[in-house]
Amino acid sequence: MEKFIELSLKEVTAITGGKYYGNGVHCGKHSCTVDWGTAIGNIGNNAAANWATGGNAGWNK
């Protein structure tokens, strides 16, 4: 079992982090990185969705 400590609002706001886009891309203050294992899976899923819908997948309407 892991131990956790509760952070105060002041401590939480002092944390600097980046943004995760949900597709394997994570960007910090000065750079971005790609988790290719996740990204390739998303590329495959998007390709299959576009093929199955004739290019009319949800984000291409």
Swiss-Prot record:
Superkingdom field: Bacteria
Chief localization: secreted
BP term (GO), one: killing of cells of another organism
Residues excised as propeptide: 1-18
Location in or out of the cell: Secreted
Disulfide links within the chain: C27-C32
InterPro entries according to UniProt: Bacteriocin_IIa, Bacteriocin_IIa_CS, Bacteriocin_IIa_dom_sf
Any Pfam family hit: Bacteriocin_II
UniProt keyword annotations, A-Z: Antibiotic, Antimicrobial, Bacteriocin, Disulfide bond, Secreted
GO cellular component: extracellular region
Similarity section: Belongs to the bacteriocin class IIA/YGNGV family.
Function in brief: Bactericidal activity; inhibits closely related Lactobacilli, Listeria monocytogenes and ivanovvi, Enterococcus faecalis, Carnobacterium sp and Brocothrix thermosphacta.
Protein name: Bacteriocin sakacin-P
Gene: sakP
